[in-house]
Amino acid sequence: MKVNGDVLKYGDNIDTDVIIPARYLNTSVPEELAKHCMEDLDVDFLKKLKTGDIVVGGRNFGCGSSREHAPICIKAAGVSCVIAKSFARIFYRNSINIGFPILECEEAVNDASTGDKLEVDFIEGIIKNVTLNKEYKAQPFPDFMLKIMKNEGLTNCVKKGLF
């Protein structure tokens, strides 16, 4: 499981209210949520984003309200993964449950800048900043989490009888 994309970098404490503002929670349709992804933080986010790009954040990414809409929104917008120094635990678990890969790697975040090109190998836990020609080691996902992501979420795994 590998992805590559350009970095869109943000800071610490990116909460679920700026990932998907509460005023748009009248729907659970991923494509509708995606239209408003990060708009309260960066009004040009969707203009900057190319499918497959990687969001890089600081500490406590996904803090705030416990809403599954936040990782659904980011995934539906076309972001391939999020790399952060740390994640709010409920955001982390919600992301895995919907099959959206996220990694914690403080060194990679410290060195990355918006526009850098990254390659991410989730099986090995390797993040390569192609722009800087640097490689970082994150904690790879255990097999059961890889299974969830490969099958686009926990619900699909259960439907297929994998768990």
From Swiss-Prot:
Purpose of the protein: Catalyzes the isomerization between 2-isopropylmalate and 3-isopropylmalate, via the formation of 2-isopropylmaleate.
Catalytic activity: (2R,3S)-3-isopropylmalate = (2S)-2-isopropylmalate
Pfam family, one: Aconitase_C
Swiss-Prot/TrEMBL keywords: Amino-acid biosynthesis, Branched-chain amino acid biosynthesis, Leucine biosynthesis, Lyase
Highest taxon listed in the record's lineage: Bacteria
EC number per UniProt: 4.2.1.33
Assembly information from the UniProt record: Heterodimer of LeuC and LeuD.
InterPro entries with a match to the protein in the record: Aconitase/3IPM_dehydase_swvl, AconitaseA/IPMdHydase_ssu_swvl, IPMI_Swivel, LeuD, LeuD/DmdB_bac, LeuD_type2/HacB/DmdB
Protein name: 3-isopropylmalate dehydratase small subunit
Pathway annotation from the record: Amino-acid biosynthesis; L-leucine biosynthesis; L-leucine from 3-methyl-2-oxobutanoate: step 2/4
Gene Ontology BP annotations: L-leucine biosynthetic process
Listed GO MF terms: 3-isopropylmalate dehydratase activity
Family in the record: Belongs to the LeuD family. LeuD type 2 subfamily.
